[in-house]
């Protein structure tokens, strides 16, 4: 039976591990290193270099050396963060045929999944060299806050690399698995994962082989690359003051600056001062120029103070969602190379009120956890159960543009949730299901993941057809959505594709905006619900008047019509209380219509009375509480649901 390898596909470095007996072993690459730079280069002769060889020649081949590709995975080219990234890297980021952000090297275009696949192939070859056999299956890790598009793109990268991806596992969860496998007893742990490009924090409960994620939060555009960029900017600004030349405009100099910034950052974790010395960094008419700048630890900490502070809010949110206090956390696990920075350790200690656990290697622990999960899936590791969560809420757009959640964030996966919706127009034969991901109350404020049509619904009055919408999230965090007409059994489904996924910036923006606009969202939702209630009441009352108005008398009919006109006059306004008041007035008036109908029933008797009673059902506006009015676009007609 072939081995399942565990791969930590990182922004800056990647790592591969495999189970040997009861223990996971990190495998050294051909260069004798336990981690491999996540870099790919294309040389002038057409050769492709991956890992350390690519990093070694980066300075002399800046435009064809690709790094930090993980930050582009699942992102659209028009994303503002993509535009920002274009100014930070010496290689070219271009628009792919599907509108995604791709990269260009030696006149050829590559998708981020392709470039990631080159790195995965290197890890696969490393494992095969050690094991002496072919490897076809892997567990690959992703940041916990990765969206559906990014997870799908990572799985695609595995397929391109010739690997069957048995599971996509969240990085903090993998780290917890590696930490807690041999631990006895129960406890609550926090995993603080600050890597090269992303930040995650997860709270887990561990006990008797069960690893249950209680909550996760993060920032998918915060990591070592941002710290490097701050140092690069500082060095470039200092050089410009001295020499009047902006090194950021020179791609060759930019690559040398990046290399020097990363080296200085690492050195300042163990020393208080370092010297950045780059001879012949550039030249002008007067001759060659050299860069020589001293950088202290305190200066570095000042440069990145806000970046470090940005990790605190997700920690607060994760604790709140998990329902625990910082003092109730038994252990804090540090993951990712950036956690070696003394300032980071200081902030973690200050927030959680305890020294973080330093017994795991932050560069290797994620790959080890992935290998353990591979062992679990193969049956080599017994009595281990992993329960992960989905990071963002999922739902559809319903009447008035409201975002109706079917699956809340931090729901344990795999999960399946169904809800029954109905039509917004009489005789509507088709509906459009629009799928969203986010935390805002209005669908338009969240990100649309995709949409699909359900056609062939038998014509019926609005609110009568029953359309069951089902969300299904698998153990990889990948989403399937289906819609089924319960009368005909007709069904349509969609697997959310990467091209419709969220960008890193969108997720970060959504959560932060949700917090800032919580009160505003609540008010807008209340207004929409009041309008929907009013609209439904007007519809049923007008229908009842049409059918039974002659039995109510001219005076009552006139009074009801007056109330309908008054409600219509305020319905499009923003005064919730006015809409509620006029709705209540119309309800009182329509109740009198019901009384008149009952009297007519008693007088008439027989079959005619029965028909009138059926009409009263319409007047009261009662319906199945489980049916939610939904906003659907009619596909093969002129009408649209409002």
Curated annotation (Swiss-Prot):
Keywords: ATP-binding, Chaperone, Nucleotide-binding, Phosphoprotein, Stress response. HAMAP family: DnaK. Residues 603-613 have a biased composition (Low complexity). The modification Phosphothreonine is found at residue 198. The keyword Phosphoprotein applies. The keyword ATP-binding applies. This is Chaperone protein DnaK. Residues 602-642 are annotated as: Disordered. It comes from the Bacteria. Acts as a chaperone. Belongs to the heat shock protein 70 family. One of its GO terms (molecular function) is ATP-dependent protein folding chaperone. Induction: By stress conditions e.g. heat shock. CDD domains: ASKHA_NBD_HSP70_HSPA9. It comes from Paramagnetospirillum magneticum (strain ATCC 700264 / AMB-1) (Magnetospirillum magneticum).
